[in-house]
């Protein structure tokens, strides 16, 4: 997804793309194990007068939203990312593709957020679906 050349896609558009990916995967004739990655920088701005900007609170709230309220994240306007978290933070909308592909209910099993000496916040979140847990329980019982 291109977020470099404006206009950037909205979070809602990316979230809905993820839902379409979920539908495509579920329509497959075979039982598949699928891993979906969402990538992109967290809060950061590497140029201009605000170079070096990192907004840890914005990042943590975004990670919270991925687990608990992705619909609210999908409604964040692109200009909010730019204003509150730096012009490169628009990359976060790409994480919403992953989240849309996971469906409504997820379990957060891992989270990491770090602001290194560089000017880009780093984050990672691992979410698992209820379907994954059901498959895992079925394999363990067999």
Residue ranges and their predicted role:
Residues 40-48:
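A structural signal for small-residue-enriched, beta-sheet-centric alpha/beta enzyme cores
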């Amino acid at each position: 997804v291109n977020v470099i050349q404006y206009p950037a896609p909205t979070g809602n558009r990316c979230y809905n793309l993820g839902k379409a990916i979920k539908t495509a995967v579920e329509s497959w004739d075979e039982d598949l194990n699928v891993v979906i990655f969402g990538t992109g920088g967290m809060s950061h701005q590497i140029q201009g007068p605000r170079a070096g900007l990192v907004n840890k609170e914005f990042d943590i709230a975004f990670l919270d939203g991925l687990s608990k309220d992705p619909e609210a994240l999908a409604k964040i306007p692109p200009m909010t990312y730019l204003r509150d978290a730096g012009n490169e933070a628009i990359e976060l909308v790409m994480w919403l593709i992953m989240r849309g592909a996971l469906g409504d209910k997820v379990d957060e099993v891992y989270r990491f957020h770090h602001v290194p000496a560089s000017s880009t916040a780093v984050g990672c979140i691992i979410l698992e679906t209820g379907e994954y847990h059901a498959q895992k329980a079925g394999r363990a019982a067999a």
